[in-house]
Amino acid sequence: MISYVNKLGTVRVGDSNPVRIMGILNTSPESFYKKSISITKQRIVDAVNKMEEEGADFIDVGGMSTAPYLSTTVSEKIEMTRIVNAVKIIQRTTNLPISVDTCRATVAKEALELGVDIINDVTGLKHDPSMLEIIEKYCPSLILCAYSKKTITGNQLLKTKRLFKKSLEMAKSAKIPRTKIVLDPAIGFFRRKGKNSFFTKINSDWVKRDLLILENLRSIKLNMPLLVSVSNKSFIGEILKKENPSDRLAGSLAAEVLCALNGANIIRTHNVAETKEAITIAQKVS
């Protein structure tokens, strides 16, 4: 099978490269992890400088929380305003590639007009029909998450791969080469029920689904680079009985290390320094 040599923005990613770290910057007050929220100019500058000093390879900025269990949907205008303001500040602060976390075409367009390198679509291009037109025009790097508008039943590994393949077909139709694409298994976004349209409904235990995926990352990669985001996620809280996301650092680091050892190529995290150090040590002794 073909093994793709990929770049996410300007950074080479994949099995022949180090595990990369993507730092999370949220401009949405609704976000589930309050420590990641930066709204004012100075807080954004400070957060970006800190993540760069700690070793982040990318900055991922979001303007709307898509956590399935929260009622946090905002208007496109609000999301766009947050993203545009943050991107301009980040660009003046760092040369790191910027990823914009959005599934809305109008928001993606504004970000790409500003020169953003990467679009991170939690719905794998399946939410907004206009997204394909936008990405075809600007040809950004893409992070495509596993997602379905229909309820997913049966073998979760097989179904996740099928969802990836559908998103890859859609990207191909928009003339995006595979060498500009990274896949994300959407940990935390497969649920029995939720409060928005950005999650995939399943009829089985969502914690078991997430754990199954994390145990079998290599089997779902499709020879593509894989990004995994487990930082402070709900499955950690469920297992450790930690309701407050701020109490999930140890669990997050354990999960992130295992992801890296199991084949993840990029770790998206709220805890850049701790994650980078933990993965560095794990790789040295593995």
Predicted regions and their residues:
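Structural preference for beta-strand elements that scaffold enzyme active sites
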Residues: 20-24, 57-60, 97-99, 117-118, ...
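Flexible, glycine/charged-enriched surface loops at secondary-structure junctions
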Residues: 174-179
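Short beta-to-alpha linker loops that shape the active-site pocket of alpha/beta-hydrolase fold enzymes
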Residues: 62-64
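Active-site-adjacent loop and "lid" segments of alpha/beta metabolic enzymes
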Residues: 4-8, 31-50, 66-85, 89, ...
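Catalytic PLP-binding core of fold-type I/II PLP enzymes
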Residues: 25, 89-93, 97-102
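Short polar catalytic/cofactor-binding loops
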Residues: 26-30
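N-terminal carbohydrate-binding accessory modules
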Residues: 1-17
